[in-house]
Amino acid sequence: MPSLSLMAAGNDPSGLAVAPGAVWVTDEFAGTVSRIDPGTAAVAETIHVGDRAAGVAVVRGAVWVVVHPLSGHRGGTLRIVAAIPRLDSIDPGRAHMPFPPQLLGMTNDGLVTLRHTGGSEGTQLVPDLAVSLPSPTYQGRSYRFQLRRGIRYSTGEPVRPGDFRRAIQRDFTVGSAGALFFSDIVGAAGCTRHPRRCDLSKGIAVDDAAGTVTFRLRQPDPEFLYKLTLTFAFAVPAGTPDHDVGRRPVPATGPYLIYRYEPGHELVLRRNPRFHEWSRAAQPGGNPDQIVWRFGVHPDAAVAAIERGSADWGLFAFPFSPPGDRLEEIRTQYAGQVHVNPLPETEFFALHNRVPPFDDVRVRQALNEAIDRNVLVSLYGGPGLARPACQVLPPGLPGYQPYCPYTLDPRPDGAYTTPRLALARRLVSASHTAGMRVRVLTDPGFAPATYIVSVLRALGYRASLWTASGGRFRALSSNSRYQVQISRGGWAAAYPAPSDFIDPLLSCGAFRPASDANGNAAQFCDHRIDQDIQRAWRLQSSDPQAAGRAWASVDRLIAGQAPWLPTVNLSAVDFLSKRTGGYQFHPQWGILLDQLWVTHYRAGAASPASP
């Protein structure tokens, strides 16, 4: 008898029943029941049942299918108001801040993803466009994926194995920040040196006939599957340009497509007619028929729009938030509509370790001792949005253990109390650097930077602000050629792992001299700490608990060397309208917009009224 594979009947078989001359298999998310000929192992017939086919049984020759009804919350328009002036990009290879997972995670897909649900389960890896999660082979240096069958882009073009190699090659070609995540793929070093000639055919082998993608790495990477969840690894079809797509989105695979994008004004998502739900864990069908996102709305106007019901959701996080006292009023008055959640993010100033006076560890430690982090909490929006930070890792990440050596009477619980200005002045005196000119690089209007200037002056430096914005700011802060002394920074975890904070930002390998692509703005390199980083890496796949302890140790060692001036860890405030339900907060992506539902909608409703 031929070998029988349930996958022949669909991507997500949910039930099986055997009858004389037939095997019946249901596929829940395709809404089908299929009859397989056991003699040939071929699908002889497929019947669409209209709802989710959860199981099947054969009773006295009759085939019975158990169905779950489709969501009763589907329909309507979800209206979003955002204070951010614009997205940096809608290109999966270029989008980085501020909302790429929330937005592009609804429109596009990779081989794997995080479970699409709120709470701690949201950190679990699940297959997306791949059939299953592969186990690494060849001592952890190879991963082979089998693609799901029958998935198409919104254009009707099928998703092919080569689309995943194209996506990652394109990261190098377009100068994506995501290229750093894939530097261990065989051939990536050549792509870094010559991006326009990037060829990863040796590192990413594709077989269109078999529907497989095989990654070959130079060395084991226990976080490689996490890296494949990022937008930088989302499939892109042939013909995708080797530059930012601008206003023309990459064709969609997810439940929504970008219907219209007007930078700085509006983005509209509508249902992707080619989408079918292949895995509820990875990419469930959304509830709203349409999602309209308006940009550049003042926080006070956004609050007013939600209050009167002309908008459904606003995210308030530094720097796009009402004043702290107004935020507290909202939390009190609309307690049932407001959700506050910590973000996996650390705000900091990078102290450029190879540029005087911050080439002296005593000066770096002095500034960490001198700042009042309670003042900084108020400047970042108050205790509803910020908490003092003295270390690199934010709360919630594996390996995080509260630690604050830069406070009066350091405590085992890591709590911050007050600064030690007298100690800071003694450290500066010992360094013989008082009186030097120091310029603090920041974007315009950033109040915490003004405060840092005042502290530097109190320590005896001739300090001033240096403002730049956009690409100019990024180049100045990253490229060591410009000899910047201190620059504003901030980092949110791309995936739930401590190495995503430490390795790309503070390892020796992350420092690229005289390069705009340098991720280590502090220019920090401590070879002893680097050895500990490598040890923590090696432990991750074999002993996660020991790895967590190792990362906590690395975090403390880095704090002692003070390459950064950590300031706060941020929280986000989600404010929802009364007609909105189904709130879920994903630990990595934030609010799951596609799982919200809106009540009192009119079928076929068009764009929302302006707030």
What does each of the following model-derived ranges do?
Residues 80, 425-493, 572:
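Ligand/substrate-recognition segments at binding pockets and active sites
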Residues 81-138, 169, 249-251:
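N-terminal lobe/hinge region of extracytoplasmic solute-binding protein
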Residues 146, 165, 173-238, 260-262:
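Surface-exposed binding/hinge segments that line
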Residues 206, 365, 377-380, 410-417, ...:
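Extracytoplasmic/peripheral linker and loop segments enriched in polar/acidic and small residues
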Residues 354, 358-400, 558-563:
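Periplasmic-binding protein-like
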Residues 259-270, 292-355, 378-379, 450:
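Extracellular/periplasmic solute-recognition and catalytic clefts
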Residues 256, 384-427, 442, 447, ...:
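Structural transition elements
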Residues 115-120, 220-290, 298-301, 421-422, ...:
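Gly/Pro-rich hinge or "lid" segments in bacterial periplasmic/extracellular proteins
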